[in-house]
């Protein structure tokens, strides 16, 4: 039994929709292999590499030993300067008494470092350079025991001067080289950074996919709040980020990794947490650069790696211990740089740097959130500046007199809007107002006039020239239409390709923005009210389904987004009702990627209708369905129209006849007729239609035409489609259909007619009349474009010819001038000779 939603006018709360988005993203993620690789595996690999690196580059254990008798005998020692003060002399003499050393005094101006450098390693051991009365420089051989032994002996001698016998124990620990020591502090932050950097493009590409495949708009059109979409994705991505982050930090702390296992361990944990707060919104900002999933997959990973990681690597090499403050501030806008800089500060126990890095990551995260809000609003569809171009008006279009029914509908809508019928408050007070009101919406597309000329460099760099009447072709996709849809009514938009019906639906769903006019859904303005889609069900022409969700999960998602159900059983009843109605029980637990085209279409319509939306927008709902399924769908839509206002675009006359209470036929962006199917059939139908197929068109068509003119004087030849010759008989014709049939049958052999048919005019014939009109308009527009190209080419040729003529004239003038000059010169020469 189906649960009737008593709260269908209300939209679920922010929290309810937020929880649905978390559930939805969880389902998609656990079925995505890329999620486990980039979201879990890579971060854990980087953490494991850091632990291994810390154990491999260990700085010990070395060896401990004691020396009570340091034998420095026979070692060489160089002393400078020669002249020493009394204290310095006493120190040297004491050392002479203690140890049998080979003392060499160098000249006062001797540069001891250079002197030692030029000596062979075997001949030098130690050097002492006295600087003034206080300073002493000690030079020593880099052999492992030289400096401890010499310092040991030096201090024993120093204390001996004061009569103190000093006993020192030496402990020598073998350490790795200085380069190896610094390598860990350089590599560990970079390795951790690279492990976590791929979170950024992975989450960002999911948003690009939503936008490219229409998922985002589809969810919003089906009652999801825009704020819930962004907030839900941000929170879910951050929760996923926390899984490897917390596990990884615990492992790093357990293995006592330098910087993590320290007095700053609390700050190190906060550094990891705040990195996600900054990095995820940063990725969401980057994704606005891309419109296609394929392009984002190709470029976002290397782009993110270069932009965020290369600066960190360069700074780590250029400033291994301390980065200049101005450089840090400039690059801190990049989350991975801040993260790497904070990790480096941890390894050097720089607590203050870690603290302000945490603050920077929090601040940058806030900045990116603000950017997301403004960019998302900026990228929404915009109005075009209306360019009135009389030349773009179709001659055929101008010759058509607007239908009285269309004019009456227009006046009704204008009066309704003027009286406040489109206003939200008035709509609440008076439930009799139409749920859908279209008030003169107008949309034009502007294209540059075709030309063979290449744009200039300036035009290419600036994105082209500004659209004007002279350099543009204006296509009026929707040329000012007015209509309304009442409750419990299905309104059909019928028209050939290019007539503007799909554009009209895109304007009502917010995918396009009207250049003029407005629409109202349940009393809310499409142009002005942000929550206009709070009780909407939308089914696009192409199936917008999530490949990794089952049929049941799709219906669960859209039901939770659109309806308020009090219990789980009510929700189950609602889902089961639509599964049974659409006869898709056997595919209930199948993913949409495994469904046939017809089953996918059924699921799309079911997702649109579930949740009892007040306004339903169906774009060719019976596409891909077989005839039986199509008839079942028509019956189902008619059954479920209670308390709904439905707009349906279609090419099918049968769909109009079976489903629609009223229909509007669109041609070239305008509504040409509007009313019930029967009203249009009687108003525009011509009584009867006769179709004749001659044995030989060339030989028999003239005789057939003369026969029709004599027998049926009011008959009008309409068209020739292949071998068919069609005639319309007006309703004023006095002969019945049976009489017409008998006359044609009796003359069939004489006129050499292969076959014929006679029938009452149908809505299909009415539609074909307007379709022919659309075809003539399209031909005229094509001819106009060809004429524009020819005119441009002729102008270019004329300009070239004029330039050539000017060049020829210039050449002739130059030749004449030269001849005149030669004549004058000859005359002057003759005069000189004479």
UniProtKB/Swiss-Prot annotation:
Lipid bilayer topology: Multi-pass membrane protein
GO terms assigned for molecular function: ABC-type transporter activity; ATP binding; ATP hydrolysis activity; ATPase-coupled transmembrane transporter activity; lipid transporter activity
A GO BP entry: sorocarp morphogenesis
Main subcellular localisation: membrane
Polar residues: compositionally biased ranges: 779-789
Alphabetical keyword list: ATP-binding, Membrane, Nucleotide-binding, Transmembrane, Transmembrane helix, Transport
SMART domains to which the protein is assigned, alphabetical: AAA (SM00382)
Chain sites annotated for binding ATP: 495-502
Domain ABC transporter, residue spans: 452-693
Superkingdom field: Eukaryota
Keyword NADP: no
Name this polypeptide is given: ABC transporter A family member 11
